[in-house]
């Protein structure tokens, strides 16, 4: 074959390759276009699914947000309803209080109107009496002039003297009636005020003892507390002034002493020593000093709590600390601080009923026994010491007078002083408030019967009602009815002179005469 033939074949091959490449490229492009269209369709479908999911998620979030918002709104509405309910309750309570006050004012107004009517009636009676006196005076004057031929001046003098005596007699009777009625009304009002104050206030009281108990982890600790040859227990007793009683009581040590502050210091120190485990004289001295400082701080806090409880302020810090010491002071088993708080509240309630200064009454009631906090350290009665403290720390004159007069040592110069004395008597005389040792109680009853039986004609005497009444049986052949009254008065006077007792004692003399005959 020639060259031309190869050239033709080569050209044909190139042409065929071009044609095949063209169609192959076209088919590949179509395949890519179809794949792109398929992918685009898938993307659109995925976008639609994603959009639908996003739409649902947004819808759920919107519903959740709406639900939360509705819950918050409902919660706020409930809170507002509760607040409105509380406000409505407070308004109803205030309305009831106002109604009670209105009723009280109405009753007082009725009493005033009744009293005014009574006064007007008595005034009218007095005017009538005055007219009658004038008529009688004129008649008497004319009669005297006619009968005795007296001058007008002499007749006037005689009639004026008689009229004066008659008027004074009538005025005395009227004055006695008015005083009696006023006394009855005052007694009734006082009983109402006292009963109202008592029923409005209820205080908690605890029985005070002279011992404290410290619990131990085991009985081996007792030996460590005693120490070698008893040096530890001697050191603790010397530093605190408290007796330690270590007996067969399991896992316990008893602290005995009549000073509650020292006993509290000893208790705290011993508890710290037991907890620390190191018990020797130097450590004991360190713990006692630390406990004494803690007790002093606790006393100050107790005083501040007492003033806060009563609602008064402005008391000198040193006086507040002295007030806190009353927590560790008792009188006939009654805690003096609790007693002072009770007196303060009672005095404040009674002052409110009488329209007096409630805050000043509470202040006077809280401080009325302040002298008992240091009466074992300073010479003088607790009243004298209290007056000195009130004067030293510049208390109100009414408070000082209430301190001085609450036992009748000084005359009360204000209504608040009288209220404090009444509140003090209420708190002390309330059943269960104060205790009395069995020995002194029995001795007082025996002495009461001895005084009663020291009079002639007494057959037997009996002290009853816990010593608040004594009944004396007398011999009827020795003591008659007249002498029985005199004997009751004499026994009463002798009891007042020779016996110390709380409250009052009723003396009853019983004389019985029996006539017995037997029918046969």
Swiss-Prot record:
Topology term for the membrane: Single-pass membrane protein
EC no. given is 3.1.-.-
Listed GO CC annotations: plasma membrane
Which ranges does the record mark as transmembrane?
A: 4-24
Provide an example Pfam family for this protein.
HD
Keyword Nuclease assigned to the entry: answer is yes
Cellular compartments annotated: Cell membrane
Q: Does the keyword Transmembrane helix apply?
A: yes
What this chain does, per the entry, is described as: Endoribonuclease that initiates mRNA decay.
HAMAP family per the record? RNase_Y (MF_00335)
The identity of this protein, by name, is: Ribonuclease Y
The species is: Exiguobacterium sibiricum (strain DSM 17290 / CCUG 55495 / CIP 109462 / JCM 13490 / 255-15)
Taxonomic classification, please?
A: Bacteria, Bacillati, Bacillota, Bacilli, Bacillales
């Amino acid at each position: 074959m020639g060259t031309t033939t190869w050239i033709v074949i080569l050209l044909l091959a190139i042409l065929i390759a071009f044609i095949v490449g063209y169609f192959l490229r076209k088919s590949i492009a179509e395949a890519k276009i179809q794949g792109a269209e398929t992918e685009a369709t898938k993307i659109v479908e995925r976008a639609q699914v994603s959009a639908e999911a996003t739409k649902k998620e947004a819808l759920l979030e919107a519903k959740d947000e709406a639900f939360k918002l509705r819950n918050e709104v409902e919660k706020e509405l409930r809170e507002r309803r509760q607040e409105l309910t509380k406000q409505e309750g407070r308004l109803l309570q205030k309305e009831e209080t106002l109604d009670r006050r209105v009723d009280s004012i109405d009753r007082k107004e009725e009493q005033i109107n009744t009293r005014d009517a009574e006064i007007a009636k008595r005034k009218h009676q007095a005017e009538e009496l005055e007219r009658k006196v004038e008529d009688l005076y004129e008649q008497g004057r004319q009669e005297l002039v006619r009968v005795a031929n007296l001058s007008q001046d002499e007749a006037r003098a005689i009639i004026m003297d008689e009229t004066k005596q008659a008027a004074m007699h009538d005025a005395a009777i009227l004055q006695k009636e008015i005083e009696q009625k006023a006394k009855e009304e005052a007694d009734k009002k006082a009983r109402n005020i006292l009963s109202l104050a008592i029923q409005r206030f209820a205080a908690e009281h605890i029985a005070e003892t002279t011992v404290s108990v410290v619990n131990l982890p085991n009985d081996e600790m007792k030996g460590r507390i005693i120490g070698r040859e008893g040096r530890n227990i001697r050191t603790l007793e010397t530093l605190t002034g408290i007796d330690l009683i270590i007996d067969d009581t399991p896992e316990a040590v008893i602290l005995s002493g009549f000073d509650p502050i020292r006993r509290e210091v000893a208790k705290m120190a011993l508890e710290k020593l037991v907890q620390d485990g190191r018990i020797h004289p130097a450590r004991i001295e360190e713990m006692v000093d630390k406990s004494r400082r803690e007790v002093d701080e606790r006393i100050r806090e107790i005083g501040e709590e007492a003033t806060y409880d009563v609602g008064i302020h402005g008391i000198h810090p040193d006086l507040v600390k002295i007030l806190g010491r009353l927590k560790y002071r008792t009188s006939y088993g009654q805690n003096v601080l609790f007693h002072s708080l009770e007196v303060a509240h009672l005095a404040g309630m009674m002052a409110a009923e009488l329209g007096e200064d409630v805050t000043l009454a509470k202040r006077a009631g809280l401080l009325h026994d302040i002298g008992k906090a240091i009466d074992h350290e300073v010479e003088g009665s607790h009243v004298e010491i209290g007056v000195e403290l009130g004067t030293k720390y510049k208390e109100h004159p009414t408070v000082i007078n209430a301190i001085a007069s609450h036992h009748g040592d000084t005359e009360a110069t204000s209504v608040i002083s009288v209220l404090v004395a009444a509140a003090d008597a209420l708190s002390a005389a309330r059943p269960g408030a104060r205790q009395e040792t069995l020995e002194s109680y029995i001795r007082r009853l025996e002495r009461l019967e001895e005084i009663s039986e020291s009079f002639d004609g007494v057959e037997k005497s009996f002290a009853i009602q816990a010593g608040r009444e004594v009944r004396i049986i007398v011999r009827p052949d020795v003591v008659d009815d007249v002498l029985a009254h005199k004997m009751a008065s004499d026994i009463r006077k002798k009891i007042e002179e020779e016996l110390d007792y709380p409250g009052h004692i009723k003396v009853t003399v019983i004389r019985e005469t029996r006539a017995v005959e037997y029918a046969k």
